[in-house]
């Protein structure tokens, strides 16, 4: 990797990272791990102090409070991302080659893998000023990638339309490395991400919908706290009375609230008000707020299981696995854009579950993604057999590259699903954006790069 440039642009003053090598910088990294694992509200200063084998009071000598530790953690990651994306090439003044940018961003993300998902899910807990600073950095990084994509598309005589959404998808893919613990080497991760980036760069932008280069979403999944009524569930929460305050109505209202404000900021009274009942009526169905969260997560897990079971029943063992995989992706995109808050909650609030429920949910998520990966491997193997039969070694080489092994297939599944969900979140789950992000995800699962 080309060494980062030394004249890095400083991030906004409100989000300056601690000086490298300082005690405060060390605290920031440990805090990032804890906030990523537990969530902002569930993390206590004692958790961070315990990891550093010191007392909380010792931390306060370097950092004033918990929020400042959180902000330092986010600033450290954001600054590293900005540095990784800056122009490091010595050839001319144009944008650096796409592969160079993606490699640099991937290696930086890999070095922070245990904490890379921090501001993907926890950014809503930043102050508005700090959140805006994160978005500014994110926009600059995305713009640099989009410039490199346009260069690549012009080299292949392609219309540059869709470069912005392709760049957003690339960042989602790289960020997804922080969402799993699939066994990969750093070089394997870099090879996979650069291969995906080249595929996405040449993905036709005709399905862009509302995802123009100016408004193509937030690839790192930063929560803005704003959603359309359809996406937030505000218009779909039933106004229930008395005995009609059913379990499903309460869960629907809770999902909308948890999505907008975060689990810890929501009260049973607020959920009850959304469905037109007193909080006491909700306690007839749920012993407390945590039970509502568990029920909401379980409902989404069931939604995924039903999707996979129905799909498996429809596609028998003799079906073309590539066709089956595309069909499954199409169904997932439909669910993601119609149940966006449900899916966001399913991935972002596990830290608020009990240890037992959290483990159970993570195991369910792993099983679900493994079913995707099995189908992807079958599709890739079938493609290899087909290309061998036609005697096209160049195509075969591309199909097998970083695509057939189980671990890399699982990583591709994580990346593809992240592109759909991040794209939906960044466009407030606007229906017109579904086709574009589904198209990009399809290029991740089944590469379409010309030979």
Where are these regions (language model features)?
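Generic hydrophobic, amphipathic alpha-helix propensity
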Residues: 23-31, 48, 73-77, 81, ...
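Amphipathic alpha-helical segments used for helix-helix packing
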Residues: 109-131, 336-356, 414-421
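Ordered, small/hydrophobic-rich secondary-structure cores
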Residues: 21, 29-32, 36-42, 50-186
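Conserved small-residue-rich
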Residues: 171, 235-304
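Helix-turn-helix
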Residues: 26, 30, 34-70, 261-291, ...
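Amphipathic alpha-helical packing segments from all-alpha helical-bundle domains
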Residues: 128-154, 356-384, 388-391, 397, ...
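Hydrophobic alpha-helical connector segments
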Residues: 86-113, 309-341
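Hydrophobic/aromatic-rich alpha-helical bundle segments in the mid-to-C-terminal region
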Residues: 153-227, 231-239, 362, 381-444, ...
